[in-house]
Amino acid sequence: MAGISIFGLLPFTSPDIVAVNVSHIFLQMALWRSSDNLVYLPPTPVSKVLSTDDYVTRTNIYYYAGTSRLLTVGHPYFPIPKSSNNKVDVPKVSAFQYRVFRVRLPDPNKFGLPDARIYNPDAERLVWACTGVEVGRGQPLGVGLSGHPLYNKLEDTENSNIAHGPIGQDSRDNISVDNKQTQLCIIGCTPPMGEHWGKGTPCRNPPAQGDCPPLELITSPIQDGDMVDTGYGAMDFTALQLNKSDVPIDICQSTCKYPDYLGMAAEPYGDSMFFYLRREQLFARHFFNRASAVGDAIPDTFILKSNGGGRDVGSAVYSPTPSGSMVTSEAQLFNKPYWLRRAQGHNNGICWANQLFVTVVDTTRSTNMCLCVPSEASPATTYDATKFKEYLRHGEEYDLQFIFQLCKVTLTPDIMAYLHTMNSSLLEDWNFGLTLPPSTSLEDTYRFLSSSAITCQKDTPPTEKQDPYAKLNFWDVDLKDRFSLDLSQFPLGRKFLLQLGVRSRSAVSVRKRPATSATGSTAAKRKRTKK
């Protein structure tokens, strides 16, 4: 009888098994530890934004629409209130303001169409697509000056021979500049967005008196009358320059905005900017430094002080005066047609909500008209400057022309859900309502809502549709009665037909006189011979 012993088991005996040598086996369990590396989940898929070409069908019907001559006149630097109250008597009209036209279009679904069979009103809706635009500008080219009678100027740092000593209490001077030259045109179906630097909110304790405030980049819609960047930066001068002397008077109490091209280009649906035209020109004309105490002192490691009683270090807060230089008709962006074939975003020119926003800036026609009138009733016989009054006015002239293409949208369930996600008011404008799922909770409904015996009930929402841009200021242009199919009767329409290669036939047929056949024989000429 032999015995077998295995580690971990009790020995047992068997008469039929011979003795076998078995070595001991030791099993050691490993301790599992989680990895110190971060576990990254797969990225969330980005919701796909469709191009309007994927669900909008274009027809071969084009309309022309144009405005009348649009004029505006005012003071180029500031609004002038009435003497009796604070109402504005003369508005501020400057070439360095944005002109944002809100163009209202007729509803194509309620429009008199040449052929009613082009779409099915039960399953389709009509929309406008902007395919051509021309922004006309009147008035001659000119340069309008801006400035400040008390401009914060300490020294001419370009031509100064020696730095000045301690600054006085008031070293301001009367300085005028010709601002930065800008030509801009933005087309979209929502207002354009602008950006500027404003006063931010500190994270900890508020800054002490005299400390530099934090800055914040603010994005807001560009409205009609907002100031453009004139060469001093896009910032809120009212909140960030409290001395009211660092910039010209036309912007010292304003906010200069710069178009947020990056934000509008990254917009998912591409409604605020179908395309844009831009030309900017600027150079520094004069170089000054600022008065007042320097907030950020120059470190001692940056300069070497002179021996003995050296002079004080001057102000290192430098600031140039801008200049837009020469204006010329060869560099004009206006008074010429532009055809929209492919937009930069997903919206290829579709005018949702039957409206279009045209943003224009043109500083090449910035002439300020000087008006002089006598202050006395008697006619002047000799010149006396005290007997005359000088006034400033600025006038602008615009003309907008468009070519619109009639398009239709097939309202499938997927397209309707997509449009509702993009803009929920579109389906409401098309008389489509959404049925909300029934509520599973028990709600209270009182019978007499106006009774004083019950608690005050919530006000019912207004039935009228609210204008989302009611609180914004735009130049409203109504084109609901200015659409025409006769493209050949309008300047932009003829240019559009010409670039399509379509010739308009004359309505008057010209009758040609048939050639008469010669019945008689012509006499042969005798050949001259020299004798």
Curated annotation (Swiss-Prot):
Source organism per UniProt: Human papillomavirus type 10
GO CC, alphabetical: host cell nucleus; T=7 icosahedral viral capsid
GO terms, molecular function: structural molecule activity
Top-level division of the source organism's lineage: Viruses
Description of how the protein assembles with itself and partners: Self-assembles into homopentamers. The capsid has an icosahedral symmetry and consists of 72 capsomers, with each capsomer being a pentamer of L1. Interacts with the minor capsid protein L2; this interaction is necessary for viral genome encapsidation. Interacts with protein E2; this interaction enhances E2-dependent replication and transcription activation.
Keyword Glycosyltransferase assigned: no
Protein family (similarity comment): Belongs to the papillomaviridae L1 protein family.
One Gene Ontology biological process: virion attachment to host cell
Protein name: Major capsid protein L1
Gene from which the chain derives: L1
Task of the protein: Forms an icosahedral capsid with a T=7 symmetry and a 50 nm diameter. The capsid is composed of 72 pentamers linked to each other by disulfide bonds and associated with L2 proteins. Binds to heparan sulfate proteoglycans on cell surface of basal layer keratinocytes to provide initial virion attachment. This binding mediates a conformational change in the virus capsid that facilitates efficient infection. The virion enters the host cell via endocytosis. During virus trafficking, L1 protein dissociates from the viral DNA and the genomic DNA is released to the host nucleus.
InterPro entries (UniProt xref): Capsid_L1_Papillomavir (IPR002210), Capsid_L1_sf_Papillomavir (IPR036973), dsDNA_vir_gr_I_capsid (IPR011222)
Span list, region Disordered: 511-531
Alphabetical keyword list: Capsid protein, Disulfide bond, Host nucleus, Host-virus interaction, Late protein, T=7 icosahedral capsid protein, Viral attachment to host cell, Viral penetration into host cytoplasm, Virion, Virus endocytosis by host, Virus entry into host cell
UniProt-annotated location(s): Virion; Host nucleus
